[in-house]
Amino acid sequence: MAAKVKAIPEGFNTLTPHIVVREALKAIEFYKKAFGAEEVARMPGPDGKSIMHAELKFGNSMLMICEEFPEMCRSPQAIGGSPVTLHLYVEDADAVFQRAVKAGATATMPLADMFWGDRYGKLNDPFGHEWSVATHKKDVTPEECMKAAAEFCGPKPAGKK
């Protein structure tokens, strides 16, 4: 009797981001260089040049990528941006952030030690996707986090609740 097929394939988690990019080959190389991603799979598109599907491993997580095909899926450039941020936890946020900028990302929020306990910053990749990069530095209780958030956000202007 054949073994039961797993509902979630080996190496994947329950939730796996699947992004659309223009120039998927360049995006794959960027993610490898900037974030240390490992290419796991690649399926060429019908023209033999584009990427219909690719899988990259970031630590213990997977990211699926496909080329923009206007009749099926559109990139952030085609729709005027993306409201989604891909969050990446790493051992050394400073090193990864610098490497990503050197590889072509644009820093949009410099790295800083944040009130929730992470060293955290944000950047945009050359393909229209926003990334946050963080290293968890300190465990913070929900109460400590709420207090620190209030201090971080500062006093509210008069008449505002």
Which ranges hold each PLM region?
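Vicinal oxygen chelate
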Residues: 1-22, 28-29, 33-124, 133-161
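C-terminal catalytic core of tyrosine-transesterase DNA break-rejoin enzymes
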Residues: 127
